[in-house]
């Protein structure tokens, strides 16, 4: 999480580092979002980035026969990765009516993979006798969230979904940044960043690799100039987008029989979100608490955007007005062992600590502070305490309570104010 004054607890392996940063650069990327359709929770349905991770990081072929649901050009990269891994790609179901193909998309077309433009997966069907994806029903899109009455069924045991992203906004919002929504790109964006705080890369709405690198270099120069390690001119901001957004505006397709899951953690369907608004819980914060959407292990990472879209539609508000629920620390689960930390505490000493030592004080731990317990050798502890008590009682004593803090009382009636609750008179 992020805490006041750029205090960042960072977990690395078994250790928690407590970092107080002068400047912070967040390059935490974006979170891929799911499409919402009937039976979208069947095993065999996964995000395109999940399929790519299985292939490239773990060397696992995620299926044998695949369909790719694409609302952006990233889906075509996934299709090529699947082909290279030995998966038979039946088709790319393209949500966009008129997609702008890049080189990767054209490479998929050149391989003879059918592209079903302006279409959606309306329903996923389990294989007979199995609780696993067996086929998908593909229909033409008739309008926002609506499909035509008839379609075609494609046999497959793998469906890869690439319909958009949302920035990993949690830490930035904890620091005071604001989350807005850009209707043109159908994406959440981050604005009003606090001082000493930079973002770069896909969290900043950049997707091209060269643009991401340039943005990171710019953020680093701003931070390094601020702390004085370099003195270089900062280049102009990288163009935020090239007009080809990775987000499809409405990958949500209700089905009369339900089971179109918005939040997989809490088994929440489209109707659960809509009914919450009909019951009077129209604010997205209340929708969360009434429906428990976003309260599971993923903490809304994969449901916040779809929920905001549904709540906005149901309440006749914009998605920017609807927003998302408050992101609070911790961002990721932390073990009790991390919180326990090492068995030591900071040593705090008053301004006259060493004068106490010169006077023969034996120190004790009072909270976080070293304070004198008594003056004299430990073997004469009780005698020393008795002598100090007698001295203070019969003569005078001075005690240093600066370690306890203080209250600054000002004003013409300050003295009378103190007189009224202290056991002695100040004035």
Sequence positions of predicted segments:
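Residues forming the flavin
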Residues: 1-349
